[in-house]
Amino acid sequence: MTFRTLRRRRFPAALALTAVLLIVPAASHAGAAAPGAGYSEVPRKVCPIDWRDGTFHVKKLIRCAAARWTVPGGASKALAIANRESNFHPRAYNSYSGAAGIYQHLRHYWPGRARAYGFRGWSAFNARANIMVTMRMVHRGGWGPWGG
């Protein structure tokens, strides 16, 4: 296969992914702050750090969440894993496995995890949701393959 053929095949997929990424973040906040939300809802006042301000702020959010939910290995382990999984890029995506976000949640598990840990309807590409869900999961079950 030539480079030109590969480029022609990947362009429509890249265009579609770009369109989805532009639409999803706007819609991903819809159910997050609804009044009367369930007990698992994470209030915005918990680690009120705007991750969109760059990698420094993503790391700061990870440190805050790791301290809030006391994860095994603390913030240093949480940072090392995020660095390995996505290099702290909220939009990281593995097209082979479908893993997305800072901590690379598989797309078919993300909706259930997000719902269970207070981020119903949020995108895995939202760093706040991805980090908070991960820290709560790790607090409950430790680091390791989650498998569902």
What are these regions (language model features)?
Residues 69, 90-92, 139:
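Functional surface patches built around histidine and acidic residues
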Residues 1-49:
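N-terminal prepro-regions of secreted/extracellular proteins
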Residues 58-65, 74-78, 102, 106-109, ...:
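Stable alpha-helical elements in mature extracytoplasmic
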Residues 96-116:
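Substrate-binding/active-site groove segments that recognize
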Residues 119-129:
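A short, structured beta-strand-centered segment in the mid-to-C-terminal lobe
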Residues 86-93, 143-145:
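Secretory-pathway/luminal and periplasmic proteins that interact with or process carbohydrate-rich
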Residues 41, 145-148:
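Catalytic cores of secreted/periplasmic lytic hydrolases that degrade extracellular macromolecules
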Residues 31-88:
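Export/targeting segments at the very N-terminus of extracytoplasmic proteins
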